[in-house]
Amino acid sequence: MPTGFQPAESFISFGQPASPPYKGNEASSSSRKGKRKASDTPAPGEKQTKKNKKDKKKKGSKKSQPVDEPDKKDGLPGLSKKQKKALKEQEHKARKSDRKRDNSRGIEAGPRNKKEEQKAAERHAPWTELVDVDLCRDPVDLLTEEINAFYKYVSPTREEFEVRLFMIELITRTINKLWPEAEVTPFGSWQTQLYLPQGDIDLVVAHKYLSDANKQRLLAELGKAMRQANITDVVAIIARARVPIIKFVTLEGKINVDISLNQANGVTAGKIINQYLDALPGARQLILIVKYFLSQRSMNEVYTGGLGSYSVICMVISFLQLHPKLRRSEINPELNLGTLLIEFFELFGRNFNYNDVGISIRRGGFYFSKASRGWMKGQSFLLSIEDPQDKDNDISGGSFGIRQVRNTLGGAYELLSMRLFERAEEMSRNARSGRRSTSWKDKEGDDWSILGGVMGITKETLKQRNELTRIHLEGRLHHKLSIPLGADPKPFVQNYRPPPIISVPSVTDHGRGASSPPPPAESSKRNKKDVGAIMVEDDELESDDDSDSDASSYSSSDSDDSDSDPVAISPRTANSRSTSRVPRADISDTESDGIIEISQPFESSGRGRKPLGDSEPSEDEIEVLSNPPEESRYAGGKGRGKAKVKDAFRPPTPPLPGQEGQLSDLSRPPTPPLPPGEEEEEIDSDEEALRRILAESDGDLGSEDEIGKEWQGAIQVDSDSDEEEKKGRKKRKRGVRSEERRAFWAAKGGNRLGQSSGDMSD
């Protein structure tokens, strides 16, 4: 099926790009601006200089013959070794410039050498064995199931987890033997449990006698201790870096290990990230996908210009925090991972404004202006991500290759979209022909996989995972640590943590909307173009009276943040009012200057609300004003999201006896209670409200003053008489409906269904 997408293989493919054609002496002469050395070969029709003749005599007849046939066919004379070398360098520069030009246009040039090309060809999608394709209703479900299957597949098994745990314990015992008072703490991907099969282990050593002056000497001692303990045979000491570390690869399992000294901020960052991950379902799956995607393209290291794990985690968290449908709790992220992954690639690969906008995940997440913080630094193309621990620190400022990363993410968006269209066409064709159950089973997973178009498992990864499993089964590390085989490692390990629990919902069991938080119920007659414009904080009414009891019951936990608690997280649930953007009052003046506001359809503050009747309210305003403060529009319930006309348009009414002084400034006066079974039902729309008012109202209503007198009298009727009580109830209901009808036409301008502004009576 022809699609509107360009072939995305040119963006992230692994095919070798064709080299540009050689332009001969034309490129050479243009690069030198018309100047040539005396030793150069003369152009056609130009006389040879004396120096060239002498050179020919010295070099003999051997050099006077043509060097190779292609040059002879092109009419070019023989070339010397020096000229050949110059031509090769020139061709290399031309290829390099073309590759740079392609990158600037959004085209990645594929593998950089034959080894990378071979690795790309060896990739396959073994996680597809965990996907039941026949139960997927559409390609989006298929992609979501693939993401969950990939997450399960790359997550560590019990054997792999314990090998890493025992390796950390072995290194810890070696360090404690060298420095008995030192404290070793793992952090990074081990702390968040977001490491890949070939991921490294980050450790920090804290000691009260460690200082910056003796760090280099202590790192050398630490490296020597690692070699003597047969943990590794080669240690690299990076002492002049901003964070001095030692790096080595373990002999058992070939695991990369980084050890730093007295860097406690890494441990704190891991604790903060774990809080975010617990509050954002689906974040772990997306983070592992993006990390693996960048890792296979050598774009996961900051020192090479790529994005580090910390930056990737913050990007995914920010994406989930600010996603409109997640802010309104309309979808379950874990059942819509396929859509979210494509939208993530689209945002940071096509639409994100890297030049002007920075990312912050603090206080619910927001975007800010880079210029307001002085983060332009002459390189506006760099990605800026605020450190959750320090708002003045840019954790992604060192990723100088972000433009190539952006092009790669954009290519992934194009390729995944194209594969979705292909699978949709194939599913539709199979459904029409009745071959659904057999068509997919006859194919290999690599053939129908959507996610396999942008990533895959290499043989090198499989080999290392098998090696870790073999080490565990043979008990090599058990023997070194004196741990019995099959025993629970908790009593024998200092930095013990339980293995991760891998549990993800399946769209084949629930469907995308079954177990998701129920979306707000919308009226069928509501203006559809307004849906989706309301943010979570739209229906939060601000109170002038700080003593309002209702205000504390629905205020966002993010808005209660103080400067002493820079990271406050409230898990987003269907019944909670966690906001994705903190109000300006909770952000300092210096911080709020650069915050980019998210456009709202109207001002939701109670202070700026216009009185009823001044202008025709919008559909959204009607809904916000109609909801009482103690009830959330997003809370589960039958009538959630419906406009209660009796609350939206009713003017203040006299309180019942005994209820004086019980009304707050923000709450509307309650109506007289009706007997059981006669409660008013919620109205879906304005037309429904008007139709009911006109249908149930009597035609003998008097003036407004008369109604008020009769109503006051009806309240004071003696309850001993049933007949008088019924009569008073009827009068009270007529008065209420008359008030409703008057307020309704006052709000609407009184010009609908033949009514005029002056014709408000019956």
UniProtKB/Swiss-Prot annotation:
Disrupted gene: phenotype observed: Increases the level of AFR1 RNA in the cell, a main efflux pump of azole drugs. Decreases growth on very low carbohydrate medium and on sodium dodecyl sulfate (SDS). Sensitive to flucytosine (5-FC), a precursor to 5-fluorouracil (5-FU). Resistance to fluconazole (FCZ), ketoconazole (KCZ) and itraconazole (ICZ). Cell wall integrity appears normal. Normal growth on rich medium, in presence of amphotericin B (forms membrane pores) and Congo Red (perturbs the arangement of the cell wall).
Residues annotated as domain PAP-associated: 336-393
EC supergroup of this enzyme: transferase
Single GO biological process annotation from the record: polyadenylation-dependent ncRNA catabolic process
Pfam families per the UniProt record, alphabetical: MTPAP-like_central, PAP_assoc
The keyword Endoplasmic reticulum belongs to this UniProt entry's keyword annotation: no
EC id: 2.7.7.19
GO molecular function, one term: ATP binding
Bias type Basic and acidic residues, positions: 65-75, 99-123
Reaction equations catalysed: RNA(n) + ATP = RNA(n)-3'-adenine ribonucleotide + diphosphate
Biased segments, Acidic residues type: 536-549, 677-687, 697-707
PANTHER family listed in its UniProt record: INACTIVE NON-CANONICAL POLY(A) RNA POLYMERASE PROTEIN TRF4-2-RELATED (PTHR23092:SF15), POLY(A) RNA POLYMERASE (PTHR23092)
Assembly description: Component of the TRAMP complex.
Name of this chain's protein: Poly(A) RNA polymerase CID14
Native organism taxonomy: Eukaryota, Fungi, Dikarya, Basidiomycota, Agaricomycotina
